[in-house]
């Protein structure tokens, strides 16, 4: 089994203006992997560039991959996968996931997952809170469709997922 070392900016030199790069070099000598929850995604990228161990994005303003993985695993747990093995790469292939809510970090990550795993996302966001496709980083609009009406976005969906309607 493993152990967890939980550090906040108050528990480390990160809160005392030590460069992220230096913290990455030191911390990664003591652990097998690092998970970071922070606001700016660039902080994770900088840490990872100087780390000796894998770095997991626990949450940033731009992305929330751990939550999307948890949602996908919950889908597999309740609905199974196409081949009955629980294979992550096939579980949503050809399916439709409806996203209703703010075009935030979770919406961005659902779009990335759709492109990687071969499903379609139906997006319904409030006006002024749309997904910024340059942040989401999707290469093609083939993996998503945008709907003004949330009910239309959810019609025929295999999975409906949501978050706040508008972030504060």
Model-derived features: positions:
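Phosphate/diphosphate ligand-binding glycine-rich loop within oxidoreductases
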Residues: 1-76
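Glycine-rich phosphate/diphosphate-binding loop of Rossmann-like nucleotide-binding domains
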Residues: 1, 78-162
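Tryptophan-centric aromatic hotspots in well-structured domains and transmembrane helices
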Residues: 54, 99, 165-166
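Surface-exposed loop/turn and secondary-structure junction residues enriched for glycine/proline
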Residues: 15-17, 23, 71-72, 109, ...
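Short glycine-rich anion-binding loops that position phosphate/pyrophosphate groups of nucleotides
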Residues: 40-41, 164-168
């Amino acid at each position: 089994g493993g152990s967890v070392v939980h550090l906040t900016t108050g528990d480390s030199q990160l809160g005392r203006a030590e460069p992220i790069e230096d913290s990455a070099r030191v911390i990664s000598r003591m652990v097998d992997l690092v998970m970071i929850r922070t606001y700016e995604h660039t902080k994770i990228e900088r840490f990872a560039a100087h780390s000796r161990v894998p770095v997991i994005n626990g949450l940033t303003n731009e992305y929330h991959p751990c939550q999307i993985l948890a949602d996908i695993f919950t889908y597999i747990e309740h609905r199974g996968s196409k081949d009955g093995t629980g294979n992550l790469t096939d579980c949503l292939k050809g399916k439709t996931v409806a996203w209703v809510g703010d075009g935030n970090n979770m919406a961005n990550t659902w779009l990335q997952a759709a492109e990687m795993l071969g499903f379609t996302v139906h997006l319904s966001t409030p006006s002024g809170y749309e997904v910024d496709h340059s942040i989401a980083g999707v290469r093609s609009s083939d993996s998503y469709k945008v709907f003004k009406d949330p009910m239309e976005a959810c019609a025929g969906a295999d999975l409906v997922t949501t978050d706040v309607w508008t972030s504060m």
